[in-house]
Structure formats: structure tokens, C-alpha cells
């Protein structure tokens, strides 16, 4: 839903919510970690693997805005790093670092529905996009800047709905 200064999505206000707010909403289902992909700076993320939002279930992905200094300190103190792909590692945070990480503001919320969506379902739920961009292979990016939503519509894979504050849409 659209708010005066941003949007409210999955019960959280963007901008304004922190990872602690996500933890309050999702409890121990929320898993916080740093993700480091080769050639890119690490990012602070949190996931809920089995989230139900109304009639649809799927995976929630929260992106937080941690400073490069905090990310480096947390990585230096990390409990462990484990590979999630050839180029990406998940970095577990120590308790004191996780407590600090929970205070970081959310900048984006993603949702990967467990069921396949199609163009008709997107139009029914969100209306006509302001713009449709062609991506790689069979992926289209449906842009809804007024509501802070970008959807990656994948003819062969899972869709990704990404929410940011409308004021941050172009930047993110």
C-alpha cells in the first residue's frame, strides 16, 4: 500500500523499517547474513524461506543499508563463510554483530512467489506497468515506479517482486 512518504509492504514501511522490524514480524524464521559475490561489495540480507502473504506463499528477501565499514568489521569477525554458488558466499554474523545489523534500515524487500505468475496475474494485481524492459533470455522487467515495485517476469523460472521506497526507485 502506498504511504505518504513511501510504501508499506509485507507490514513494513519503506523507508523507515529496520531489520529489527522484520525480525519482530517474522521471528526466528528471519535468517540474517552477509552475502559476498566475487567482484562486488558484500551486502547485508535477511530471508524468510516460507512466507505466506495472503493466498500466495514464497521466499522473502530483505536488503539492508549497512555501511562499508560495518560490513568489513562483521566479515572480519564472522563465525563462518559457506559457499552458496561458485561466486557467492554466505557469511554468518556473530551475536554482537547481528544485534548491530538488526538496527540497519531496510532499503528493499523482495518476494519470490512459490507459484508461477504470468502477465495476466500481474496486470490483475498491479495494473498496467509504467514501462516494460526486456532482460536476458525470456525475462521482462515490469516497472511500477509510483508504487516502488519492479517485477522480473520470467517465462521459464520464478518471478521476483522487488519493492523500494518510490523516491528511491530510480536509484535502486
What do the PLM-derived regions correspond to, one by one?
Residues 19-172:
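A cross-family detector of function-defining hotspots
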Residues 6-12, 108-111:
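Short, recurring structural edge motifs at helix starts
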Residues 4-7, 43:
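N-terminal functional modules and adjacent low-complexity/disordered segments of proteins
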Residues 15-16:
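Glycine-centered tight-turn and secondary-structure capping sites
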Amino acid at each position: 500500500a502506498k504511504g505518504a512518504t513511501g510504501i508499506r509492504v509485507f507490514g513494513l514501511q519503506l523507508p523507515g523499517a529496520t531489520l529489527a522490524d522484520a525480525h519482530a514480524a517474522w521471528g526466528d524464521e528471519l535468517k540474517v547474513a552477509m552475502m559476498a559475490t566475487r567482484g562486488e561489495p558484500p551486502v547485508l540480507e535477511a530471508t524468510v524461506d516460507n512466507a505466506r502473504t495472503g493466498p500466495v506463499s514464497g521466499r522473502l528477501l530483505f536488503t539492508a543499508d549497512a555501511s562499508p565499514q560495518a560490513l568489513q568489521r562483521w566479515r572480519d569477525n564472522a563465525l563462518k563463510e559457506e559457499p552458496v554458488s561458485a561466486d557467492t558466499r554466505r557469511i554468518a554474523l556473530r551475536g554482537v554483530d547481528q544485534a548491530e545489523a538488526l538496527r540497519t534500515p531496510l532499503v528493499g524487500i523482495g518476494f519470490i512467489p512459490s507459484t508461477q505468475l504470468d502477465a495476466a496475474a500481474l496486470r490483475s494485481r498491479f495494473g498496467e506497468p509504467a514501462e516494460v524492459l526486456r532482460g536476458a533470455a525470456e525475462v521482462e522487467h515490469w516497472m511500477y515506479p509510483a508504487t516502488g515495485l519492479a517485477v522480473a517476469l520470467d517465462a521459464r523460472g520464478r518471478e521476483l517482486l522487488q519493492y523500494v521506497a518510490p523516491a528511491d526507485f530510480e536509484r535502486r
